[in-house]
């Protein structure tokens, strides 16, 4: 493979940065959604395997997945711009793409603000930048409206479960922590050293969360928490909810839907107090 890549490098070593942006590849589902919001949908030629929104993205060629990036395919497609996800795409493979001279936009989406910024920044590559500028503006306006609506929610200790075997959660500033924090949530595993730590049922019991959230695909065993109803306040008080994982786990304009979903659940707890 290295010999093939070396040959291709000789063919495409000229920098592409000066070329007009007509062919775009996205290496992450959230970057694909943001590209469409920025007005780049007509320029997308390939995306990641899990890029399933909007519907048009499903028809595009697939060049990456959780295992890595198909470098040879990307090189033969000759993109003018690659949308990469530094937190999810292999750094070494991104470095190789840089060495080939490809223009790469790194989608940094660690905060709610970053979503609007990404849309606005990518709009410059659209034939009609106003599409992205309008969508970025609408996103920010809606975000501020939600902030005004839910800013007085009390603090609620929560646990968010990403998977069940093993049990994985989120810690620190890692996505989607800010969505929960926006709604007054306090992560019971906020201080964990790993960004997405593996935890045990016993640890969750000791943390005594007031609310528990899962993604639909996270629970293969629907009864895994049943024996602990009396031990965990969230379960005892029926504060256990499934969330739309695409809305929540992908930092895109649809995150606004996740915010409303989470905030409404926290608000329902307050109504019972």
Swiss-Prot record:
The family this protein is said to belong to: Belongs to the BtuF family.
Cited Gene3D superfamilies: Nitrogenase molybdenum iron protein domain (3.40.50.1980)
Protein name as annotated: Vitamin B12-binding protein
Organism: Vibrio vulnificus (strain YJ016)
Signal peptide location: 1-18
Quaternary structure and partners: The complex is composed of two ATP-binding proteins (BtuD), two transmembrane proteins (BtuC) and a solute-binding protein (BtuF).
Classification via Pfam families: Peripla_BP_2
Molecular function GO labels: cobalamin binding
